[in-house]
Swiss-Prot record:
Compartments, as annotated in UniProt: Cytoplasm
Described purpose of this protein according to its UniProt entry: Catalyzes the phosphorylation of the 3'-hydroxyl group of dephosphocoenzyme A to form coenzyme A.
GO CC annotation: cytoplasm
Main location group: cytoplasm
PROSITE patterns xref list: DPCK (PS51219)
Family to which this protein belongs: Belongs to the CoaE family.
Keywords: ATP-binding, Coenzyme A biosynthesis, Cytoplasm, Kinase, Nucleotide-binding, Transferase
Single Gene Ontology MF annotation: dephospho-CoA kinase activity
Organism, as annotated: Sulfurimonas denitrificans (strain ATCC 33889 / DSM 1251)
Gene Ontology biological-process annotations: coenzyme A biosynthetic process
PANTHER family: BIFUNCTIONAL COENZYME A SYNTHASE-RELATED, DEPHOSPHO-COA KINASE-RELATED
Name of the protein this chain belongs to: Dephospho-CoA kinase
Enzyme Commission (EC) number: 2.7.1.24
SUPFAM superfamilies the record matches: P-loop containing nucleoside triphosphate hydrolases (SSF52540)
């Protein structure tokens, strides 16, 4: 059975989840990256994307994720169509990798951006990368160059970050600088080790 030792790593758009995943990895945690799996599956499905959404969403053999993202965030039918195609494939790959990680009998992370929204993963514990919504919006605009309205629309297409914070087993606060974030990540890893060693 998959997910026995899994901890879901989640957050919101522009909360710094990728940075946290890298820092936790440097601190010895093993990470399965759902986004990377999704990108690989999407690129391998460029023909399907071309047939279902049009030629303009494929550059050569790769899917133009930026263009497709703009469509998905503005068209709910297209979003559901893509999700119903991708999600079972992503889940199957994550499950396969999870079974392999479970064989080490030590906690590991599965980086799942829409963990709470999808409800597709039977993972008991979670850690959320948190920043207050206004800072999340500010960082997203700075990173992506979208208008405030477009940025808000994308952020609000996901569950509110405060709600995710409430549901999480642990919270990593990313509202400070990199040094603060490094400390938060180190403390989280120590908590996991302490909890796991207690169980042993």
């Amino acid at each position: 059975m998959a997910f026995k030792y899994a901890i879901a790593l989640s957050g919101g758009i522009a909360t710094g989840k990728s940075t946290v995943a890298s820092l936790l990895s440097l601190n010895g945690m093993r990470v399965i990256d759902a986004d990377a799996i999704s990108h690989d599956i999407l690129d391998a499905s460029s023909l399907w994307v071309r047939e279902n959404f049009g030629d303009e969403f494929v550059d050569g053999v790769s899917v133009n994720r930026s263009k497709l993202g703009t469509l998905i965030f503005s068209d709910n039918i297209a979003k559901k169509k893509l999700e119903s195609f991708l999600h079972p494939k992503i889940r199957a790959e994550i499950e396969q990798r999870s079974i392999k990680q479970d064989s080490f009998m030590f906690p590991y992370l599965i980086d799942i951006p829409l963990f709470f929204e999808s409800g597709a993963y039977d993972i008991k514990e979670s850690v959320v990368v948190y920043v207050p919504k206004e800072l999340q919006l500010e960082r997203f605009i700075k990173r992506n160059g979208f208008s405030r309205e477009e940025s808000l629309r994308r952020i609000e297409s996901q569950m509110d970050i405060e709600e995710k914070k409430k549901r999480a087993t642990w919270v990593i606060d990313n509202s400070g600088d990199l040094k603060h974030l490094q400390r938060e990540c180190e403390e989280f890893v120590e908590k996991i080790k302490a909890k796991y060693l207690e169980k042993k």
